[in-house]
Regions:
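Charged, amphipathic alpha-helical linker segments immediately N-terminal to NTP-binding catalytic cores
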Residues: 272, 278-313
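ATPase nucleotide-binding head domains, primarily ABC-like/P-loop NTPase cores
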Residues: 297-488
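Active-site phosphate-binding and catalytic loops of NTP-dependent enzymes
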Residues: 31, 84-87, 108-115, 174-188, ...
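Divalent-cation-assisted or electrostatically stabilized phosphate/pyrophosphate-binding catalytic cores
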Residues: 222-223, 228
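Gly/Lys-enriched N-terminal cap/neck module of very large, oligomeric protein machines
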Residues: 16, 20, 31-34, 195, ...
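Extended, Lys/Arg-enriched charged tracts that mediate electrostatic binding to polyanionic substrates
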Residues: 156-205, 301
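Amphipathic alpha-helical coiled-coil segments
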Residues: 45, 49-52, 59, 73, ...
Length: 488
């Protein structure tokens, strides 16, 4: 369970998700990352982190293997199942780029399965990919067009068109030269309108030129006229162009039908590269924020060494400042009560811990020393005491109580709970006992809890309990300003 529904927004993970999505190449990767989330399975979390390790290692040693090309062609694959439908040349170019990327990666890691087992397992359809590439490369040339060698008929039509175009051009240029000498033409050259060579004639001389008007300029001062001398040649060219288009479509239709049986392999290859694309984006984001892989164990614990909130650290860096790292541990002690002045950094401590735990269970490195130890939790919950809801007719404190009840109803030994200013928003005579009762309930459920407070009663209560760790935010009593350091 993740609580509340806007948990990611509260701790800042929504911004991290958007930043990672912005680094992706393929649209399918962005869809995957939109649905990407927290896992409470130890083996799955380790798998995700191992995948990042492999990408990081490969990026350091053979970065060219991770240079992705092409675009996501998944939305075009239904065409493969429609009779007489076909992929246009631009789609084939994209498919070739993607499959070449897949092939390059497959060849690069297949011989190093011990080093890159996850990546190698993602690119195993090499035989099918090779077959598709062979078929496509026979038809589509290096310029992304149907090759003149695609069929004997296509080759002959291309040759006939080339020969007739040259002949027609000579005739039209000859007429153009004569008319230019007479001063009938505009300053532009021979051009093409409706697949026919035409001459730009000044409007005042149009009746002096034998031919057919094919177009008029926006100002009406120039008419584009097909000279009568080229009419028969242009007509024949138009027929050849139509025949070439029909033959081109026949070739593309045949190629599409030939590749259609490989649809599942094409989808599998695209899906695999989307996974790799996601790992590349995640790894790049992590490294750009100085994140490292922590030690992972399948138990509900959290031990952070020199941890910072990545978004706060990035923001402060822009201001030429630095975030104050925090070190904290919830292992033998299950509850940490953090006290300190307003604006002293208590909420940042709470959100940093919850965010980093969420990040690692999403498969990301964390902004803390690699010696940090992170466990696996089944529930993550945070209540910041600012849940006023006009729609539900709830005051801030009522919403706070509602949130606490939701957390208590679902808490257990595998829960990590963050409670910011627990019990605040009402008379301290009532707020402090409520806060104490909630913490006692969470203790009895063996949950891990980080609670910030101003109540001295909570500090006194926790002082005599071995499972409760007392912490505070350091304050410079001489300068009268907070130091943003967690002390425990």
């Amino acid at each position: 369970m993740i609580y509340p529904v806007n948990f990611e927004e509260v701790v800042g993970f929504d911004s991290i998700r958007k930043a990672i999505m912005g680094r992706c190449r393929y649209s399918g990767t962005q869809v995957k990352l939109f649905h990407w989330g927290f896992s409470n399975q130890f083996t799955e979390v380790v798998y995700r982190l191992d995948a990042l390790d492999e990408v990081r290692n490969l990026q350091d040693r053979m970065p060219s293997l991770l240079q992705l090309a092409g675009a996501d062609y998944t939305d075009f694959t239904p065409i493969l199942n429609i009779e007489n439908a076909f992929w246009e040349e631009e789609i084939w170019v994209v498919v070739v780029d993607v499959l070449q990327t897949y092939k390059k990666l497959s060849k690069g890691v297949s011989g190093r399965r011990e080093e890159f087992p996850i990546l190698a397992s993602k690119v195993v359809e090499l035989d099918a990919v090779d077959q598709v590439l062979l078929k496509v490369n026979k038809i589509i040339d290096e310029f992304g067009k149907v090759s003149v060698k695609a069929s004997p008929a296509y080759a002959k039509l291309s040759q006939d068109i080339h020969r007739l175009e040259q002949e027609t051009r000579q005739v039209v240029r000859g007429v153009f030269k004569e008319l230019k000498t007479l001063g009938y033409t505009a300053e532009t050259d021979v051009s093409v309108r409706e697949e026919r060579l035409v001459i730009p004639i000044l409007a005042e001389h149009k009746r002096k030129v034998q031919g057919f008007v094919k177009d008029v300029s926006a100002t009406g001062k120039i008419l584009y006229i097909e000279p009568a001398q080229a009419l028969e040649l242009n007509n024949r060219l138009k027929e050849l162009y139509a025949e070439l288009r029909r033959e081109r479509e026949r070739i593309l239709r045949a190629l599409t039908a030939e590749v259609a049986p490989f649809e599942s392999y094409l989808l599998s290859a695209m899906d695999a590269l989307c996974d790799v694309d996601a790992w590349i984006a995640m790894c790049a984001w992590c490294l750009s924020h100085g994140a490292e892989r922590p030690k992972i164990s399948d138990e509900p614990r959290i031990s952070l060494l020199n941890a910072v909130h990545p978004l706060l650290a990035a923001e402060l860096q822009l201001r030429k400042s630095k975030a104050i790292p925090l070190t904290m541990q919830l292992d033998a002690a299950r509850v940490m009560v953090v006290s300190g002045p307003n604006a002293g950094g208590k909420s940042v401590v709470l959100k940093t811990a919850l965010l980093l735990q969420y990040m690692v269970q999403c498969g990301l490195y964390i902004t803390a020393l690699p010696e940090s130890r992170m466990g696996i939790f089944h529930q993550l919950a945070i209540d910041c005491g600012d849940g006023q809801s006009i729609e539900q007719g709830l005051s801030t404190f009522s919403a706070h109580l509602k949130g606490l009840k939701e957390i208590l109803d679902n808490a257990g030994p595998r829960s990590l709970v963050g409670l910011d200013e627990i019990g605040a928003g009402t008379d301290p005579r009532f707020g402090a006992p409520i806060a104490q009762a909630v913490l006692e309930q969470l203790l009895s459920k063996q949950s891990r809890v980080i609670a910030t407070t101003h109540f001295s009663q909570l500090r006194e209560w926790g002082a005599g309990i071995s499972d409760v760790l007392q912490a505070s935010m350091a304050y410079d009593v001489h300068a009268l300003k907070p130091l943003y350091q967690l002390v425990w």
